[in-house]
Amino acid sequence: DDYSSPTRLQRQVETMNKYPGLVLCGSRFRELTGNKESEQRVPCTETDQAIRKSMSLFNPFAHSTVIFRKKTFNEAGGYNNKFKYGQDYDLWLRMLSLGEACILKDELCTLRVSEQSSSYQNKRAQKLEGLIIRWKAFRQLGESPAKNLYYLLKSLVGLVFPSTRNFK
């Protein structure tokens, strides 16, 4: 199970109260595999502008670190059942059309990574859904076509030919 710092929710709620335009607030995190802790593998993008730029490249939020406004969740239509493994990523993208987001600089959550987890067991399906959502983000947020197409094609090649997943 994932676990949070005792002050995580308080700090995130204070941030949301301080900035009424925020609809989504995450935090940095650590990963725990077995008994080994490591830094987060996802690049940390803290500002709304950086988060928007990253959405068509990767999901900058770890679900366990996120709080959001219920009103915005409802306005965005909640979780989309078309996605089994990327519901959160899709929701974050839709919520960004309704307000701003941030990721707090401090590591306020530890995520347990396990080979038994649904995410680990269904990596291929999760990557495919991520690719679909990244394409949606690319169209919605209008980032650089060349850069985004490179990453979209790289992800697609990695899905079709898994042994090439780590090419640069």
Locations of regions flagged by a protein language model:
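C-terminal subregions of glycosyltransferases and related glycan-biosynthesis enzymes
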Residues: 83, 89-90, 97, 101-168
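Nucleotide-sugar donor-binding/catalytic module of glycosyltransferases
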Residues: 1-124
